[in-house]
Every structure is written in structure tokens, then in C-alpha cells.
Amino acid sequence: MNWSEVFHDITNRHDFKEMHDFLDKEYSTKTVYPDKENIYQAFDLTPFDKVKVVIIGQDPYHGPKQAHGLAFSVQPEGKFPPSLRNMYKELEDDIGCKRTVSHLQDWAREGVLLLNTVLTVRKGEAASHRNIGWEVFTDEIIKAVSEYRDHVVFILWGKPAQQKERLIDTSKHDVIKSVHPSPLSAYRGFFGSKPYSRANTYLEAHGETPIDWCGEEAQRG
């Protein structure tokens, strides 16, 4: 199974013509993030048969030079968002390495599917592309990973992500849940939750190579 087959199966069962027509108009008349060629970057960087971890986000960042198709990740020249800073703070406390880069492309190449539930957004208008069809598409992606892959770690931060647990076969996958890393909630249970080491412990217990969360640029403790 690969992403092309997954996409083919999804589009056979759901009609996304209205969504694509809407997006064509949006991209031609407004500023939309990410750039069109980066909408599906999460799937380009993480092949289906390499998925080990799924981190579920919500909408892309809606500021300039930020969104590039990976949940929580920011373009190298983009402004560092607070949620990502908190993710890195927890990473340092959990594993002992200090990341300084704003993008998560190395995580994606390691097998971490960084999946937003909505894949596009209008500049400066959070949630502007919700309920146009993306949620149907990404729910099917989650179900496909759950059905056709084994021993994947699903990391669900915040209530919207945790609502996706119903799509996951928890008898053969691990689910790690906490509040969102946003500054509004991080101190209510995200800090100290150790998602990175917990994910690796599960992967190693099932014969998988652990994720290198630190990356080459990180300072390791």
C-alpha cells in the first residue's frame, strides 16, 4: 500500500470536486497557505509504508512564511510559533536535546506523519477553510493508517485531535494524549507528558527503529 493507492481509494468513495473548485478559486483570487505545491508535503516526505508516528494538528499557520504542509512545522525563515517552542521545551526536558530549527522536515523523513486535519487556510483568517471537505479527507487518511499499518503511535494534543481517537484501532496502535502545546494549555498537562520518549519506547518494544527527535542540528545533552 502507498499514498497513491490510499488517495485513489478515498476519492473513489468521496467526491471532492466542490472542494477542489473552491480551492482553485481561493488560490487564484486570495492569498492561501501553504503554497499550492506544498499542500501534500506531509505525504511526500513520509511514505505510507514508513509511517511510525502520526501527530495530528488542526489548521495550517495563517501568517506569511510559516505553513509549508507539515503540522506544527514552520518554513526555515518563518516566525517561530509559541506551540512549537513549547514542543521543543518538552523535548529538551524529555530527551535532553535542544532543537533550534523551526522546520520538522527531519521528523517527517524519520517516519512522523505531521497531519493537519485541514490542509489549507486563507492568509490571516484562522479556520477559514474548515468544513470545505478536508476533514473528510484527513479522517480517511487516519483510518487508512490505522487499518493498513501496524504499531503506529498516534499523538493527539488537545480536544479536536483527541476526537480522532475513534478512527484508530487501539488494539494494534498506541495513542498518546495530552492537552495542546499552546501557551494557553501547555502548563495543564503538556509539559511533563514525555510524548517523545513514550513513542520511542513503544516503537522499540515492537521491533521498530526509534525516531531521532533531536535531528542533526540539535545540541544533545
From Swiss-Prot:
GO MF term set: uracil DNA N-glycosylase activity
One Gene Ontology term from the biological process aspect of the record: base-excision repair, AP site formation via deaminated base removal
DNA damage among keywords: yes
Alphabetized SMART domains for the sequence: UDG, UreE_C
Location, primary (coarse class): cytoplasm
Localization per record: Cytoplasm
Catalytic site: D59
Record carries keyword Coiled coil: no
Keywords, alphabetical: Cytoplasm, DNA damage, DNA repair, Hydrolase
Gene Ontology CC entries for this record: cytoplasm
Top enzyme category: hydrolase
Reaction(s) this enzyme catalyzes, per UniProt: Hydrolyzes single-stranded DNA or mismatched double-stranded DNA and polynucleotides, releasing free uracil
EC number assigned by the record: 3.2.2.27
Family per similarity comment: Belongs to the uracil-DNA glycosylase (UDG) superfamily. UNG family.
Protein purpose: Excises uracil residues from the DNA which can arise as a result of misincorporation of dUMP residues by DNA polymerase or due to deamination of cytosine.
HAMAP family registered for this protein in UniProt: UDG
The name this protein goes by in its record: Uracil-DNA glycosylase
Name of the gene this protein is made from: ung
